């Protein structure tokens, strides 16, 4: 997808913009920027951590790209080596990986933007709706992996997000697309 590098920069700017408007409740931000519409919600542990759903008209608004970000105040000298790597995470206890898309300096630390992938929008929103309905949470924890110690890079490696309003928020974002 040739729109992703440009979008990553826009996401980065957007996440930094949202920092002053962070809420711990389930307040969704739904907007459009050029050819991409999005729905973003703040985390409950750190409100500056965001969960984002991006929809591009290049895909005829049929796919959603899911991202999340973590703010860290750890400042290891080699943090940039994480860029484009797949780091181990747990999503509600299930182990998988997430790709580091961007590492941005922020205040006294860094904002790390991850991707969970791109999915068919209708099926994925239904999957998340059902998943959240059973689990009653959407929790991501960054965990240790081969040659990766989470404590070196993340002071708070866990967050969760409320998704009660996921479906209507994605519907609104899709209409903007």
Residue ranges and their predicted role:
Residues 1-24:
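Classical Sec-dependent N-terminal signal peptides that target proteins to the secretory pathway
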Residues 23-177:
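A generic "folded-domain core" signal
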